[in-house]
Amino acid sequence: MHTTDTGTLPGSDYYFHTPSEDAKKFFYYLVSCGHYHTINGYSFHRDFYPYMLFLYVKGGMIRLDYMGNSYQIRAGEFFFIDCQEKHFYYTPENCEFYYIHFDGLNCHQIYPLIYKNFGCLFHQKDYPELIQILKRIIYINREEQQITEA
């Protein structure tokens, strides 16, 4: 689905899923995903959203305020946050990024351990397979008619 969010450019798209009760109970599951092209000044603020966010910056830069810290995420980097915490991000320049919101199993219980030991900012060169999986998830949602949970 093409987005009309303020600050997004043509070619931006996103997809939502409604997982089954079994998926919620037993799996990690996709909630939404997308590929955005944005202009300088695109921003997003939430006090609470019940899902996890994995966002990869392909081009440009995003500034993120999260857990009392400010981060600059540049091309080739990604952030991973628990959106149950207040967060704000914006693009101080044109930007291209991919994202997924997901949930399930013990996401919110294990995240504090990840954040404590590694923070929320990572580089693609350290996790190239994650970026390929992210792009594949978005491609499947864009091109395939039916998505299964299996």
Model-based region annotation:
Residues 25-118:
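N-terminal regulatory/effector-sensing and dimerization cores
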